[in-house]
Amino acid sequence: MSGFVGVIVSDPWLQSQLTQVELRSLNSKFVALKNQSGKVTLEDLPSVLVKVKSLSSSFKEKEIKEILGGLGSDYESDDDLDFESFLKVYLNLRDKAADKAGGGLKHSSSFLKAGTTTLHTINQSEKGSFVLHINRYLGDDPFLKQFLPLDPDSNDLYELVKDGVLLCKLINIAVPGTIDERAINTKRVLNPWERNENHTLCLNSAKAVGCSVVNIGTQDLAEGRPHLVLGLISQLIKIQLLADLSLKKMPQLVELVEDNEDIEEFLRLPPEKVLLKWMNFHLKKGGYKKTVGNFSSDLKDAQAYAYLLNVLAPEHCDPATLNAEDDLERANMVLEHAERMNCKRYLTAEEIVEGSSYLNLAFVAQIFHERNGLSTDGRFSFAEMMTEDLQTCRDERCYRLWINSLGIESYVNNVFEDVRNGWILLEVVDKVYPGSVNWKQASKPPIKMPFRKVENCNQVVKIGKEMRFSLVNVAGNDIVQGNKKLILGFLWQLMRTHMLQLLKSLRSRTRGKDMTDSEIISWANRKVRIMGRKSQIESFKDKSLSSGLFFLDLLWAVEPRVVNWNLVTKGESDDEKRLNATYIVSVARKLGCSVFLLPEDIVEVNQKMILILTASIMYWSLQQQSSSSESSSSSSDSSSTHSTTTTCTSTCTSTDASPAPSVTGEDEVSSLNGEVSSLTIEEDNEVSSLTIEEDNDADILSDITSISEEAANE
């Protein structure tokens, strides 16, 4: 059960100020420092803390050194600092960084920022709106209705999220069908493993719908940490509210395209910009002289709301609204008008006047859904006739979600548009191959000069060639011009390399050779075979994969408890294949795999996505062996710092997935040790005929060499 402990500190206040992801990161830095010189002093800290993301943008190493020099009354320069003192120093610097960035900012809502998942101050108004949203959309849920409605003024929300069911259900409300609800553990009382599985499923599924969860771990959700819970819920509600703001889902939006505007330019707009464009379209109709450019200050006087509602619902219009002299009075009249239109309140009049960005966005989105006022005549036939390459759309979605999951500073709304200046690609390349980018030669957005964009993209192509990507006749200008085929080709090679790099990082004891497709296939076949299952594949194009049975066998082989065979079909008809595929995606995420494919990719045997899914399962399985091996060899270090025994590489997901106990109740290291053990397989391949001998070296990949030989012979 050690996987649930996390990094524990004795001071409750310290524990509450940092997420488990932050604690693990800081703990690893502290342990590394201590291992270097035997102790950690103030003088050691500047060179380490300047590399921490939350501080690097605010301070240089020299500035940190000066700040730490001012702590002399609390610490001597040569004092041996313990971990908690180290954390206090970090928090001191973090507060100063926040003050330097602008003290007023840390109390304002940051939920509108795409990459935000951490908010250390709780906005009670926003929390109340989230609770009302949950009561409204999940009140009739067969499982949750026994716990709903929640009281907005209580802490019931934080208690209810602790078993993971509510968040999983909320993801399906935001993007229907994301989670196969058969994979959710919904007993009234869940054990710690079952709760952890739900949280792991939640976080991996949240990433798969576009949420940023880089600062959230399963332990944070299990504890119901308010700022993280609200940060995740706000992203899910925002995704739900903005889901229809695209031409693909609502062709009527083409009416917003102005005569001098390119349809392609409109397609590139993020949903928030489309919503503002829609609002200004109607305001112009109603004679409003200003242009609304944000969901905060431009709406504080409620005049824009009054004009908007008068255009959309003139039958409920009250002339006194525009004549009101007091902003608060006008805001109240606007809300009364909205209620007559059947728009439930997301905010109060005070919150309109205060300029709450998130609540205003939610309110405008609700008005849009209730009555968008757009034409339903032939004007939008062009949007309906637009032909889209379905596979291109799927690929763009997959790479967009993958990039956003990496934790880079930028956020991608549209791959083809957002990568054209080269900056995001440089950020991604640096994640895959740290240190490969020459940032001194890179230009950060906004970039006005076209040649600077070309320079960025040229560096991307140069690094790609150094990584041995297939980039024949590809130049940086091809990316700047938005060549979709070349962009998708580059991103596929980057995503594949990233996954193989993760696998390679676990092969250090076999001289770090590059992993090949054939080795991944051999590993998967062997894993299934040693468990006595009959399914095998020859390649990632094997048509038998469409039934889903091989992946279910593989998932069961790496962790038997995650697959409920009573829910599995024979995979013969199209409907049965889709049921299995949907279940596979959710089970893989529940296990701890960060995957972005769709069930259709399995049914149609999309070779690229099949490779990534198989490699993700392999990585998870081998990572558990690595964690077990490292925890046994470094238990003394772990006990001295109260660190979790489960380690995570810098590029792994932040879901803290812990290996569930196997069917036999034993740890996979001893009972299902396909990677660690030397296996003798009798001819009948039955489980009872397996002889497993312990490998004294506990090498997590001791059988990779034999797999490589098998692959070569094949």
From Swiss-Prot:
Residues 393-622 are annotated as: Actin-binding 2. One of its GO terms (molecular function) is metal ion binding. GO terms for biological process: actin filament bundle assembly; actin filament network formation. The lineage of its organism: Eukaryota, Viridiplantae, Streptophyta, Embryophyta, Tracheophyta. Residues 628-694 are annotated as: Disordered. Residues 124-372 are annotated as: Actin-binding 1. Transmembrane segments: none annotated. SUPFAM superfamilies: Calponin-homology domain, CH-domain, EF-hand. Residues 7-55 form the EF-hand domain. This is Fimbrin-3. Residues 628-662 have a biased composition (Low complexity). Keywords: Actin-binding, Calcium, Cytoplasm, Cytoskeleton, Metal-binding, Repeat. InterPro entries: Actinin_actin-bd_CS, CH_dom, CH_dom_sf, EF-hand-dom_pair, Fimbrin/Plastin.
